[in-house]
Amino acid sequence: MKLWLVRHAPVLLAPGSCYGALDVAADAAATSAAALALADVLPQGLRVSTSPLQRCEQLAHALYGLRPDLMLKTDTRLREMNFGNWEGQRWDAIAQSEFDAWTANFADHAVGGHGESVRAVMARVGQAFDELSGEADGVWITHAGIIRAAQLLAQGIRQVEHADQWPQDGVACGQWRTLALSSAANR
């Protein structure tokens, strides 16, 4: 099976802002362009699961407008990591000591004081990943962190203990990556 991991279009926030669980809109023109590009490459009748955050739902609905053969479903497990008190702040305004605390306990630290841990994110994304059918291709419209988690899950990695284990190669806004999965890979 093939899984398309699609990242939402650029958001309407200042560059360098932390916006994990923050529900912000994406740029409409970039969303339309991403939907148009994606519509041309997807096979007929795929199930499209989307994060409930508006930047992803915008892309899902734009894609459906071009491809009504697709089956849309919202899946809360595909929402981005909650960065707690960091949400809405500029990344460069967050104290280095906060990053150090996170990397010292990468798996279990509640990011931003009351946000999610990497372990919690991997668990919820793992649940969605485990429900993938071995025979049917699918699409996830989601976020950078969730795409990275799915990449790890596809490699059989269910948990990340250290920051250097987290994938560094990301997917740009409005772009996608495909994973070829065997039925055993998602069990």
Predicted region positions:
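Loop-to-helix element that buttresses phosphate recognition and phosphoryl-transfer chemistry
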Residues: 2-59, 111-125
